[in-house]
């Protein structure tokens, strides 16, 4: 039976976010299904035009999720029984747009959103432009750590490492995201406006994004 050593390496990586991700949600309710679709399409078109006026490409806005559902309200009838009545068709459209981190440009975007009749709910996230490159570096760090631990253990045990037999990696999704602003901070930020430039005075310096991942490597020993 082949002798083996199994070691789990931990990879650590700290990356500076370089991209703003704006996640926007628009929702509303209409009595008719077609009316709900029409209003959603109208609001989306308005939003795309707004970003186009700011120098973005309409294709930069990506849909994350869109659905229309029938909404009902529960109520108690005169006979004390509980029943449901139809309220309307509710649409929810979640979108995102990403652009290089730039407080001045972000301030202009937030100003336009704050003065738009559409007024979608939104949150600001910071991420990286090349997540795959960061994931590969993180994975390499984990393998390097596993090898260093295996070297220590094999030398202490008086054996030497052979060939790698297996490498086990979870392939879990790693989200490189920093959310430096909560809702209250965002509202305070948006109160500091600069009317002549039609932009909010945004001063955000997001912290580095710290991520950890593990890799388990099995070596033969001799």
Could you say what each language-model-derived stretch is?
Residues 1-222:
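Short, charge-dense linear interaction motifs
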């Amino acid at each position: 039976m082949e002798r083996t050593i199994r070691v789990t390496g931990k990879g650590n990586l700290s990356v500076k976010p370089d991209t703003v991700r704006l996640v926007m949600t628009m929702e509303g309710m209409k009595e008719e299904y077609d009316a709900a679709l029409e209003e959603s399409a109208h609001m989306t078109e308005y939003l795309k035009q707004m970003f186009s006026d700011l120098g973005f490409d309409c294709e930069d806005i990506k849909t994350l999720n869109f659905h229309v559902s029938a909404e009902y309200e529960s109520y108690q009838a005169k006979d004390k029984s509980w029943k449901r009545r139809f309220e309307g068709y509710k649409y929810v459209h979640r979108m995102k747009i990403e652009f290089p981190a730039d407080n001045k440009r972000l301030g202009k975007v937030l100003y336009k959103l704050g003065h738009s009749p559409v007024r979608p709910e939104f949150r600001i996230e910071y991420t990286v432009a090349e997540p795959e490159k960061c994931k590969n570096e993180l994975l390499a760090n984990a393998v390097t750590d596993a090898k260093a631990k295996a070297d220590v253990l094999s030398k202490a045990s008086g054996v030497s490492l052979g060939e790698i037999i297996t490498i086990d990696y979870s392939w879990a999704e790693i989200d490189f995201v920093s959310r430096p602003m909560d809702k209250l901070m965002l509202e305070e930020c948006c109160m500091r406006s600069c009317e002549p430039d039609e932009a909010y005075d945004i001063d955000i310096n997001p912290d580095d994004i710290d991520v950890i991942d593990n890799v388990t490597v099995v070596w033969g020993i001799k």
